[in-house]
Amino acid sequence: MTSEHVPQIAHLETLCFHDPWSEKSIASELENALSLWLVAVEGDDVIGYVGSQTVLGWSDMMNVAVHPDHRRKGVGESLVIALEEALKAQESTCLTLEVRGSNDPARTLYEKLGFAEVGRRKNYYRNPKEDALIMRKEWVL
């Protein structure tokens, strides 16, 4: 991700989430040494992105989104796979994420990619209020 991508990512946030990140919050990730963000582009347009933070070899996927016009075309899957490979190169040993319990397409994708449910966070999401499923994938370097 570069600073040029930030406005498009912020717009994508508003298309995909009930509680979107602000442009300022996204831009601050560029300065965070713990963060890794990847984008999928088509021409000059950001059609998807994924962001993570890693501390002491444990990574947390903070956000992943694909433009509604580009869903079900493998963009999200490619982003998560690319993130995993980049994290392995940084010697991370696992990737954890939260997903809305009602987000069946995302849960199905994560399970396909080898993530397993390891817990729940009660009332984690707002607008509407909903539990988060915690999923994790571990690997050996």
What is the role of each PLM region?
Residues 3-69, 80-86, 90, 138-141:
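Acetyl-CoA-dependent GNAT
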Residues 67, 71, 100-102, 127:
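Residue-level recognition of the GNAT/N-acetyltransferase active site
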Residues 72-86, 104-113:
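Conserved acetyl-CoA-binding loop-helix of GNAT-fold acetyltransferases
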Residues 87-98, 121:
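Conserved GNAT acetyl-CoA-binding A-motif
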Residues 98, 116-132:
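Conserved catalytic-core motifs of GNAT/GCN5-like acyltransferases
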Residues 111-120, 141:
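Conserved acetyl-CoA-binding loop of GNAT-fold acetyltransferases
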